[in-house]
């Protein structure tokens, strides 16, 4: 009996060891397989997530394109093309010739759209229920198209201020690029066709104005310069504007092109000063329309 007992122990031990080894082997294999399965699942999820993101981006782009198309159609339907009287096409305009009793003034803003300042200017104009005119730079419009859309949707006028805001002399081809590229983008972004042009720096003899006049643009200058590009103190800036204010006047300010903090601070005071003097605010197209009507009245009064 002792012999049988002693020979049975090793077999039991052997069975136990085999079982333990099997269990250990299974324990080693299972985590590896599970990890592989998890990795495969994560890869599948990543692929699905990436595909979903791409699909979402495509839907967003389609929606944006659809919204832009709808906006352009609505803009055209609303007649957002500034019809300038024939007598004021292809000419330089510093101000409208109105009677002293016609207390009308046009606020204009150059060099935008600008990330922060344009928004602040638009907010101030909206608070005061005033419409202005914005002469945009093409390369800035490309960066902030949504600001130009806001300009137009809130009832302001928009004009061309070239693509690069260069001052140097340009041949007709270069001038055409500067003006046409900007006008094309204005139309693409807002649906507006504008024939309002303002030369950078008021430069009259570097090729831009000659091209613009040849293309029947109204070259819109100004009669009252804020000189805000020199960043004067707010009281001086306000004084610069009011000094030459007159009925039919055009005020030059800037919403872009640099630090326009003082312009934003001065704008409410400028508006209040004009209101106290009985002025009403109009856009450049409205001002030119009034000028055109006045010219017709004068013409009909001339002796035959």
Predicted regions and their residues:
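N-terminal pre-catalytic segment of deacetylase/amide-hydrolase enzymes
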Residues: 2-107, 114-121, 127, 270, ...
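Hydrophobic alpha-helix-in-membranes signature
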Residues: 30, 198-199, 267
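Metal-dependent polysaccharide deacetylase catalytic core of the NodB/CE4 family, i.e.
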Residues: 102-105, 115, 126-258
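Residues in and immediately flanking transmembrane alpha helices
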Residues: 123, 174, 267-268
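Active-site/ligand-binding-proximal alpha/beta "capping" segment
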Residues: 211, 270-271
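A SAM-dependent methyltransferase catalytic signature shared across enzymes that methylate proteins
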Residues: 218, 277-279
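Histidine/acidic-residue-rich catalytic or RNA/ligand-binding cores of hydrolases
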Residues: 232-234, 262-265, 293-298
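Conserved nucleotide-state-sensing and coupling region of NTP-binding domains
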Residues: 274
């Amino acid at each position: 009996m002792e012999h049988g007992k002693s020979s049975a122990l090793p077999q039991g031990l052997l069975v136990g060891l085999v079982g333990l080894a099997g269990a250990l082997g299974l324990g080693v294999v299972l985590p590896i397989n599970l990890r592989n399965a998890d990795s495969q699942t994560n890869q599948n999820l990543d692929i699905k997530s990436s595909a979903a993101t791409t699909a979402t981006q495509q839907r967003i782009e389609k929606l944006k394109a659809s919204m832009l198309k709808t906006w352009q159609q609505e803009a055209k339907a609303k007649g957002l093309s500034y019809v300038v009287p024939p007598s004021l096409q292809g000419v330089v305009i510093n101000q409208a010739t109105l009677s002293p009793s016609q207390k009308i003034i046009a606020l204009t803003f150059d060099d935008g759209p600008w990330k922060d300042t344009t928004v602040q200017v638009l907010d101030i104009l909206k608070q005061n229920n005033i419409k202005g005119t914005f002469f945009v730079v093409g390369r800035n419009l490309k960066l902030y198209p949504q600001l130009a859309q806001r300009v137009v949707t809130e009832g302001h006028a928009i004009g061309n201020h070239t693509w690069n805001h260069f001052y140097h002399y340009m041949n007709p081809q270069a001038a055409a690029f500067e003006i046409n590229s900007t006008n094309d983008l204005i139309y693409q972004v807002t649906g507006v066709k504008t024939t309002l042009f303002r030369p950078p720096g008021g430069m009259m003899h570097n090729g831009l104005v000659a091209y613009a006049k040849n293309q029947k643009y109204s070259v819109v200058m100004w009669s009252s310069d804020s000189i805000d590009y020199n960043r004067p103190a707010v009281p001086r800036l306000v004084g610069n504007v009011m000094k030459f204010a007159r009925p039919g006047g055009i005020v030059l300010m800037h919403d872009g092109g640099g630090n326009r903090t003082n312009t934003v601070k001065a704008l409410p005071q400028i508006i209040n000063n004009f209101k106290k003097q009985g002025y009403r605010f109009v856009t450049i197209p409205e001002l030119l329309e009034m000028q055109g009507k006045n010219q017709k009245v004068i013409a009909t009064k001339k002796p035959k």
